[in-house]
């Protein structure tokens, strides 16, 4: 088991990786991908959506390629959509959900950094598409939603 420490002006995060029991990723993923990406997955899968946003944003703000930047923006916005749902702001959640969908569409691929984007987006739509059914989602009763669980595919992708 390995610990991760992410430090920035806004974020200090230290916890052991691979602590989760659902095996969202492998040791090969830990070795291949940025620690902020893996940390964000742990946090997201734990329902810590704002903290997942912080971890992914730490990576996004660094020097990354254009595809990775777009992917991280989509992941950040999807996490923020669930954060807004948690705090009772469906209008803001809808805005973040729409932005995430746009970013995923611009990526133009079905797998990125071992995440099956088609599956993730299908789960995202199942959880949040109801937000698009009203002119003002604040007027709708909030259903019980389940955020997608992120589980990386076994193959390691080359990313920019």
Residue ranges with predicted function:
Residues 67-69, 103-117:
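Boundary/linker segments of alpha-helical solenoid repeat arrays
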Residues 90-108:
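TPR/TPR-like (Sel1-like) alpha-helical repeat modules
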Residues 127, 131-160:
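A hydrophobic membrane-anchoring alpha-helix module
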